[in-house]
From Swiss-Prot:
Upper classification of the organism: Eukaryota, Viridiplantae, Streptophyta, Embryophyta, Tracheophyta
InterPro entries with a match to the protein in the record: 2C_system_His_kinase, CHASE_dom, CHASE_sf, CheY-like_superfamily, HATPase_C_sf, His_kinase_dom, HisK_dim/P_dom, HisK_dim/P_sf
EC number: 2.7.13.3
One annotated Gene Ontology cellular component of this protein: nucleus
UniProt protein name: Probable histidine kinase 5
Gene that produces this protein: HK5
Domain CHASE: 295-519
Function: Cytokinin receptor related to bacterial two-component regulators. Functions as a histidine kinase and transmits the stress signal to a downstream MAPK cascade.
Catalytic activity line of the entry: ATP + protein L-histidine = ADP + protein N-phospho-L-histidine
Keywords: Cell membrane, Cytokinin signaling pathway, Kinase, Membrane, Phosphoprotein, Repeat, Transferase, Transmembrane, Transmembrane helix, Two-component regulatory system
Top-level taxon: Eukaryota
Sequence ranges on the Extracellular membrane side: 1-175, 248-531
Organism: Oryza sativa subsp. japonica
Subcellular location(s) per record: Cell membrane
């Protein structure tokens, strides 16, 4: 109780010291978790992603600088050069950054190779340009077009900017995961620290108890909660800041994504347009070379048409290509005569939409300085042949700009012929010869031969591009020509209603005089920022949770502080009550046992007088009542000692079989009176001597057997002891029988339906055994002996509702149990506690109205000393005369026969079993006709071998066989013994008439079996030392001077009478002071019995003074200062002092040993206890009266 109080107080005192710091630490931890979340979410995500993007861009710039390429051209090459197309590109020169249109290389072949450089997969591969030849046959047109568009799609996804965004997003996700894990980890660590601190504070009670009264405690409470509130507010503000920061990041990333996607589309459209422009330039070179450079011309309409049809895959974005020849007015008539058609003008000058365009209906071109009639065209625009391109305003301006600058020129958007789409026309000029870069416009106009034009369907171009992009559904694209800022022309539009976000990307189509832009918007409105909401909410929840935990902890600690004073008072009261209870038990036990000692002592002295039968019965009844009261007191004291933890187990050597024989002897009279068969069986595998507490082991078995005897009116009580390992093996071999029941099946003549000791049904305890811990995991100690003890009865059983409280102190099955059967209900509770102290378990199984079986386990140690040492612990050594004898056990009930054979084997007798009369007769006939070595020495027949009095009938059958001449040698017949639980005088006459040598009364014990066999066989008596305690006590105490010290006159009379009964010379004194004066050396006393509790001076103090005097005298004798003759010629004085008290608790016994006493005798005296106490000191001087 004191320890409980200290722990309870410790929680209050220790908590006050670190409570404020604890709350502040919790708030700081929560705030640090929030900051960690923000850092991991923002800084790490952007830092990691941005670092990766910058590294990729640096490597791309290195490659661009190495090959003298601009970033836009390098990206155009990457998008253009798909796997099959990488076989075709030029070798001559580099691409001009200023004007991609004039950087058209020759139609030579080149190839890109990937050169492994290690490191990041996103870095741009090194480009190696190698010479090779162009070969159109190596192309697959369809695959080329598909690869070109697929490469454009991959460029959209895999460009450095996009990769940077993906790395950024991935790093952001990792940061979020890391931050959430870190925050949850902080919460878990905080909770663990809280629990650890609260446990640690319980150990600081004694060091901080004074803090409770200091005023700083209340101040600490107030500031702790204020700090907690501040921490929670900071955490909530942090969650709001996290939300706003993450939401701003989401918006910024959305805008950034829009910018990236819009710029990617604009760049891809520009790159694809530049590629097409290069192909148009190549056609211009083709016309210049093979049409104007050859005479006659190598190209006609058919050739041009076939060539452009077969190379359409090179110009997937163009709707048509045509070549117009420069014709002066002076050359018009000759030209028209040569070609056979008139030069026609365009229908309208403003290039309005023309549906169902028909060249036959066009008018001749009006007279002007020069004309540009179309002479070659692609099949798709074959209807424009003979049309004068100079007759249209947009086309005329386009031609004039192109031939003056030498570069490609674009028209303003206009409706294409035979379509409703807006388009543009790209015009390149074909010159007579190569002009220097610094040629003047006049020189260029003079060298002009014709014009190659290509029309682009802008809506189809944009749609085709967007279809190849995985993210085309995310944004809406519009394309404008803003050359005229006041009235921009919409070249491409979408009908989808887009969001408010807008990004504008510039597009350069190679004509510096025209400006184009792309407007991009998200198709859908932004969704809710769920990541920001969830993370900020999680932070807020974590902050509130941590705050609640700390708040609850503070409240709990405050409650502990408030209850500390009350707990301290209760602790003091509990300690006082505990002391009072112990003192009460000691006092009550002494005050009750002291008069009971007188009562029982006087009754014993009365029994030694001449009494008639009635008077003797009265005295015996009074003795039994007194012993019952003593036993009740012992049980209450045992329970008190167990509950207070003051009981300790001994570790001495003992014989299990001898203890069980003593228990059987104790209950023999009751078993005879009730007609119950009581038996014990110990497995041969159980060691002969064990190390443990024999008294507590005997108490457990005595309680269980006494409980069974109380509730059993017929049948049997069977005690069995086995090793747990042995039972486990049998349980594995036998599935349907009791684990310890190994008997063979009974003969059919046995009328009892069950093969048990009495033939009645018993409860199977297999499930109980399987629940024991030792059956699952036996002890691995080398010298450990694990015993299983089973007490089986055929009593009334235990009801289902009472089975749950059977081991509860002072509880019985029902209210009538105590009135009907007696008892207090604490025996089984004590038994359970003692079994647990022995390291075992106890359980039971019961069938109401049938039987009950109690089983318990216990752990002992095996005695591993010399086997000859075992004899010291066997009170009744077996006579060697029985060794080698043979016995036949005749019993139809095998369980009962096994008990008989167990006791015979203890005597060294070999046993055979005959379960039927036929087998018994056969064994007898064989024995009579056999040699002396194999003959039987004895036959033990159970009185109820095959039914009531069947044992007597069996011997009569033998007499009939002898009269008939079947048994010829009657003189060689073995001795016959009858085993019976009760033998009446009539049965004794029947035995003599039947010819039995003797009868052995059950329950069987080693001593009774040995005595009966010895008397009948005439062995084991010669020279045998008698072990009768009364005779030994007389030999030990005769002539011995004993001093009895007790303040109670009745106790002095009882003690003196008990000692004088055995021949001792007794002197009595009534105080400790008188005892000291009588025991001053030299004195005549051989031993002293001293009461412990006496007025003026108790037995403890008196003993200490006696030992002090003896020690001084012994020191002087050993030092030679005095002669031993002065002290009766004794060189060493030490009188045995034995405590004589009714207080039997452990504390009293320890006090006796500490003060110098030599032994302990509990009141009232009993013969066995008295012998055990004095024999150790006085037996050496005694002589055996029988030797």
């Amino acid at each position: 109780m004191s320890r409980v109080g200290e722990c309870g107080g410790g929680g209050g005192c220790g908590a006050r010291r670190g409570k404020a710091a604890h709350a502040g630490a919790g708030a700081v931890a929560g705030f640090l978790g929030c900051l960690l979340l923000v850092w991991a979410m923002g800084g790490c995500g952007r830092g990691c992603g941005g670092g990766g993007g910058e590294g990729v861009r640096d490597r791309v710039e290195e490659v661009a600088a190495q090959f003298n390429l601009s970033m836009s051209k390098l990206q155009a090459l990457a998008s253009l050069l798909s796997s099959p197309e990488r076989e075709c590109i030029c070798k001559s020169g580099t691409i001009n950054d200023d004007n991609p249109a004039h950087s058209m290389p020759d139609m030579s072949n080149c190839r890109l190779k990937n050169k492994p450089s290690g490191g990041n997969q996103n870095r741009l591969d090194n480009v190696i340009i190698q010479d090779c030849c162009a070969n159109e046959d190596n192309y697959d047109k369809n695959n080329h077009e598909n690869n070109l568009l697929q490469n454009a799609m991959q460029q959209d996804i895999g460009s450095p900017t996009t990769l940077w965004n993906q790395n950024n997003a991935l790093s952001f996700n990792h940061g979020m995961i890391f931050s959430l894990s870190a925050s949850l980890g902080i919460v878990v660590i905080l909770v663990v620290i809280t629990i650890f601190k609260r446990g640690k504070q319980a150990n600081e009670l004694c060091q901080h108890e004074k803090l409770l009264q200091t005023p700083s405690v209340k101040i600490s409470r107030k500031w702790s909660k204020r700090a907690l509130l501040l921490g929670v507010l900071v955490g909530l503000c942090s969650s709001v800041w996290i939300f706003s920061s993450m939401h701003a990041d989401v918006v910024a990333r959305r805008i950034e994504n829009l910018e990236n996607m819009c710029d990617e589309r604009a760049r891809m459209l520009q790159d694809q347009f530049n590629v097409s422009m290069n192909h148009v330039h190549a056609l211009a070179i083709l016309v210049s070379t093979f049409h104007h450079g050859k005479n006659p011309s190598a190209i006609d309409q058919k050739t041009f048409e076939d060539f452009t049809a077969r190379t359409t895959f090179e110009r997937p974005l163009m709707s048509g290509v045509a070549y117009a020849l420069k014709v002066l007015h002076s050359e018009r008539e000759l030209f028209e005569q040569k070609l056979g058609w008139k030069i026609k003008k365009m229908e309208t000058e403003d290039q309005s939409l023309v549906h169902d365009y028909n060249p036959e209906k066009l008018q001749p071109s009006p007279v002007q300085d020069e004309y540009a009639p179309v002479i070659f065209s692609q099949e798709t625009v074959k209807h424009i042949i003979s049309v004068d391109m100079m007759s249209g305003k947009e086309d005329r301006d386009n031609i004039l700009r192109s031939r003056a600058t030498g570069k490609g020129a674009l028209t303003a958007p206009f409706p294409l012929l035979k379509s409703n789409h807006l388009g543009v026309v790209l015009t390149f000029t074909v010159y007579k010869y190569d002009l220097p870069p610094d040629a003047t416009p006049e020189e260029r106009i003079e060298a002009t031969l014709g014009y190659l034009g290509a029309s682009f369907d802008v809506p189809s171009l944009v749609e085709r591009l967007l279809e190849q992009l995985a993210s085309k559904q995310k944004i809406v694209v519009r394309l404008y020509d803003i050359t005229n800022h006041t009235y921009p022309t919409k070249m491409y539009d979408s009908d989808v209603i887009a969001s408010d976000d807008l990004h504008i990307s510039n597009i350069d189509f190679g004509d510096p005089t025209r400006k184009h832009v792309m407007h991009c918007r998200f198709k859908h409105a932004p969704s809710l920022p769920w990541s920001a909401i969830m993370i900020s909410s999680a932070v807020a929840i974590i902050v509130l949770l941590v705050g609640y935990i700390i708040y609850a902890t503070l409240n709990s600690l405050e409650e502990a502080e408030d209850n500390y004073t009350t707990m301290r008072d209760l602790k003091g009261r509990a300690e006082a009550a505990d002391v009072a209870k112990s003192q009460f038990l000691a006092t009550v036990s002494h005050e009750i046992r002291t008069p009971m000692n007188g009562v029982l002592g006087m009754l014993q002295m009365l029994m030694d007088t001449e009494l008639d039968t009635t008077q003797r019965d009265f005295v015996v009844t009074a003795q039994e009542s007194g012993k019952s009261l003593i036993n009740l007191i012992n049980e209450v004291l045992d329970l008190a000692k167990i509950e207070s933890g003051k009981i300790e187990l001994e570790a001495v050597r003992f014989d299990v079989r001898d203890i069980l024989d003593n228990v059987v002897s104790l209950f023999s009279e009751k078993s005879w009176a009730k007609g119950i068969e009581l038996a014990v069986l110990v497995s041969d595998q159980v060691p002969d001597v064990l190390i443990g507490d024999p008294w507590r082991f005997r108490q457990i078995i005595t309680n269980l057997v006494g409980n069974s005897m109380k509730f059993t009116e017929q049948g049997h009580i069977f005690i069995r002891v086995h090793l747990i390992e042995e039972v486990k093996r049998k349980m594995e071999a036998l599935d349907d029988t009791s684990p310890e029941n190994i008997e063979v099946t009974a003969n059919s003549k046995n009328t009892m339906p069950y093969n048990t000791l009495s033939g009645l049904e018993v409860a199977n305890n297999r499930k109980t055994l399987e629940s024991f811990r030792m059956f699952k995991d036996s002890s691995d100690a080398i010298d450990s002996v694990n015993l299983l003890v089973t007490v089986e009865d055929t009593g009334i059983g235990i009801t289902k509702d009472a089975q749950t409280r059977i081991f509860t102190p002072f509880m019985q099955a029902d209210g009538s149990t105590s009135r009907t059967y007696g008892g207090t209900g604490i025996g089984l509770s004590i038994t359970k506690r003692l079994v647990e102290l022995m390291g075992g378990e106890i359980g039971f199984v019961s069938k109401p109205g049938v039987s009950s079986t109690f089983s318990f386990t216990a752990i002992f140690k095996e005695n591993r000393k010399d086997p000859g040492d075992i004899k010291r612990y066997c009170p009744e050594p077996t006579p060697p005369d029985f060794q080698g004898m043979r016995a036949l056990v005749v019993d139809g009930r095998c369980a009962r026969a096994e008990v008989t054979m167990y006791h015979l084997r203890r005597l060294g007798i070999q046993c055979d079993l005959a379960a039927t009369s036929e087998s018994a007769l056969s064994a007898l006939l064989e024995s009579c006709n056999s040699s002396v070595k194999s003959s039987l020495n004895m036959v033990l027949v159970d009185k109820e071998a095959w039914g009531e009095d069947s044992g007597l009938a069996f011997f009569r059958c033998l007499i009939d066989l002898r009269l008939k001449g079947t048994l010829k040698s009657w003189q060689t017949m073995p001795k016959f013994f009858l085993l019976a639980g009760s033998i009446t005088p009539a049965d004794s006459d029947c035995l003599r008439l039947a010819g039995y040598s003797n009868s052995i009364r059950k329950p069987l014990r080693l001593s009774t079996v040995a005595a009966c066999l010895s008397k009948a066989l005439g062995v084991g008596l010669t020279g045998r030392r008698s072990r009768d305690n009364s005779l030994v006590l007389r030999s030990v105490l005769t002539g011995k001077n004993i001093l009895v010290v007790d303040d109670n006159a009745v106790n002095r009379i009882v003690a003196a009478g008990a000692l004088k009964k055995y021949g001792a010379i007794v002197t009595c004194v009534d105080s400790g002071k008188e005892a000291i004066s009588r025991l001053q050396p030299p004195h005549k006393f051989d031993a002293c019995f001293m009461d412990v509790q006496m007025p003026e001076m108790d037995g403890f103090e008196a003993t200490r003074l006696v030992r002090s005097v003896e020690s001084k005298i012994n020191d002087t004798i050993q030092a030679g200062e005095v002669s031993s003759e002065i002290y009766g010629n004794k060189a060493h004085w030490h009188v045995p002092i034995l405590a004589m008290t009714a207080d039997v608790i452990q504390a009293t016994f320890e006090g006796c040993m500490e003060c110098g006493m030599d032994g302990y005798v509990a009141k009232p005296f009993e013969e066995q206890q008295l012998y055990s106490a004095v024999a150790h000191f006085l037996e050496a001087d005694a002589t055996d009266p029988l030797t």
